[in-house]
């Protein structure tokens, strides 16, 4: 019989909170982030960027960074916007979203930069 591994994520400890599937993995490097952006573009999804303070990351609403990048296929432009959002909001979580036009939903959603917990 297998056992379920416990992840020590507690509301009382903001630094332990997990935000989505990728948050249980080690932080992504630039090459991994690039591959995720390429995958979003390859699927024809529209990238969007959002950010929020770590204390409010569990809430539904995050701040939108500009408008979603409808039809953007330049991976470097998307990465530049992610970096610009992070530099403008250094203490915030920054996430990348891939909007799927066909299903009218989010096809991808991942935190690219983790802010510092207070």
Curated annotation (Swiss-Prot):
Any GO molecular function: ribulose-bisphosphate carboxylase activity
Record keyword Mitochondrion present: no
Alphabetized CDD domains for the sequence: RuBisCO_small (cd03527)
GO aspect biological process, one term: reductive pentose-phosphate cycle
Family annotation (Pfam families): RuBisCO_small
SMART domains attached to this UniProt entry: RuBisCO_small (SM00961)
Gene3D superfamilies (alphabetical): Ribulose bisphosphate carboxylase, small subunit
InterPro entries referenced in this protein's UniProt entry, alphabetically: RuBisCO_ssu, RuBisCO_ssu_dom, RuBisCO_ssu_sf
Keyword annotations of the record: Calvin cycle, Carbon dioxide fixation, Photosynthesis
Other facts: The basic functional RuBisCO is composed of a large chain homodimer in a 'head-to-tail' conformation. In form I RuBisCO this homodimer is arranged in a barrel-like tetramer with the small subunits forming a tetrameric 'cap' on each end of the 'barrel'.
UniProt record similarity statement: Belongs to the RuBisCO small chain family.
Subunit organization: Heterohexadecamer of 8 large and 8 small subunits.
Annotated function: RuBisCO catalyzes two reactions: the carboxylation of D-ribulose 1,5-bisphosphate, the primary event in carbon dioxide fixation, as well as the oxidative fragmentation of the pentose substrate. Both reactions occur simultaneously and in competition at the same active site. Although the small subunit is not catalytic it is essential for maximal activity.
Name under which the protein is recorded: Ribulose bisphosphate carboxylase small subunit
């Amino acid at each position: 019989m297998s056992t379920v591994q416990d992840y020590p994520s507690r509301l009382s400890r903001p630094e332990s909170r997990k935000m989505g599937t990728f948050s249980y993995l080690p932080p992504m490097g630039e090459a991994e982030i690039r591959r995720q952006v390429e995958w979003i573009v390859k699927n024809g999804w529209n990238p969007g960027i959002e950010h929020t303070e770590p204390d409010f990351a569990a809430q539904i609403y995050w701040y939108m960074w500009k408008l979603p990048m409808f039809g953007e296929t330049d991976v470097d432009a998307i990465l530049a916007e992610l970096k610009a959002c992070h530099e403008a909001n250094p203490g915030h979580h920054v996430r990348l979203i891939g909007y799927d036009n066909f299903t009218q939903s989010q096809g991808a959603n991942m935190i690219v930069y983790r802010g510092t917990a207070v």
